[in-house]
Amino acid sequence: MTLSLPQQGRLRAAVECRRITRRFAGQAVLDGLDLDIAPGEFVALLGSSGSGKTTLLRTLAGLEPIDQGQLQVPSAMAAVFQEPRLMPWKRVWRNVALGVRGAGARERAEAALEEVGLAHRLNAWPGTLSGGEAQRVALARALVREPHLLLLDEPFAALDALTRIRMHQLIIRLWRVHTPAVLLVTHDVDEALLLADRVLVLANGQIAEQLPIRLPRPRQASTPGFQALRARLLQLLGVETEAEPAVDISLPLSRTASR
């Protein structure tokens, strides 16, 4: 097993996985998996429950060891999970500044909170936040570290539909500004198509399929090609579908040009 954490300037890719294997009780959850993610690329990962999506993300984050293979990731990375995981005894800005070293920690935390629209909540207690606000704090906590790799483990799954749309808009805007590579783990095919440059399907411990998403941004379900990609991904996931009318779930953005 080789685990390498080179400096970002020496990386040709933000993520390089070569034949990585991770076993639990003798069962290979990741089984000789290969994966590359380019700097600044937004990748979504789909798969059935138990397919190993979260295991892969936790492996990239350094939270799970690998049993075999080679893995290269940047030293500057951050993760946002489905649960915000805020410390209730620390005010919002102190949650954002966790792990930030130097005299400017508060200023950096305040700047990150302003980016996610929560400058007015910097002295609030986490228990007073809505679900969407708490996730925005978690996102600010990730961004304050200026990551070259941002890992998102179903961060929008527990949010209501309107808040999810707003979070989608926010994450795309921040991605365009900060340009990290992003790996989003999700069960939502539409979410993957709305956000990602490339969608991967994980099955049997390996990347079974990958589809480049060349649809113009901002995207919506009625964008030409969206429904065909959706049907293809659902087929790969073993979901039988019938033709349905397109529902407009557009993501209006202030920056409309594609990256």
From Swiss-Prot:
Any one annotated GO CC term: plasma membrane
Occurrences of domain ABC transporter (ranges): 15-229
EC number of this enzyme: 7.6.2.14
Bilayer topology term: Peripheral membrane protein
Catalyzed reactions: ATP + H2O + aliphatic sulfonate-[sulfonate-binding protein]Side 1 = ADP + phosphate + aliphatic sulfonateSide 2 + [sulfonate-binding protein]Side 1
UniProt keyword ATP-binding present: yes
Pfam families linked to this entry: ABC_tran (PF00005)
GO MF annotation, one: ATP hydrolysis activity
Residues spanning the membrane: none
Entry's localization field: Cell inner membrane
SMART domains cross-referenced by the UniProt entry: AAA
Binding site for ATP: 47-54
Keywords: ATP-binding, Cell inner membrane, Cell membrane, Membrane, Nucleotide-binding, Translocase, Transport
Keyword Transmembrane helix: no
General function of this protein: Part of the ABC transporter complex SsuABC involved in aliphatic sulfonates import. Responsible for energy coupling to the transport system.
Oligomeric and partner information: The complex is composed of two ATP-binding proteins (SsuB), two transmembrane proteins (SsuC) and a solute-binding protein (SsuA).
Matches recorded under PANTHER family: ALIPHATIC SULFONATES IMPORT ATP-BINDING PROTEIN SSUB (PTHR42788:SF17), TAURINE IMPORT ATP-BINDING PROTEIN-RELATED (PTHR42788)
Family note: Belongs to the ABC transporter superfamily. Aliphatic sulfonates importer (TC 3.A.1.17.2) family.
Name this polypeptide is given: Aliphatic sulfonates import ATP-binding protein SsuB 1
Name of the gene: ssuB1
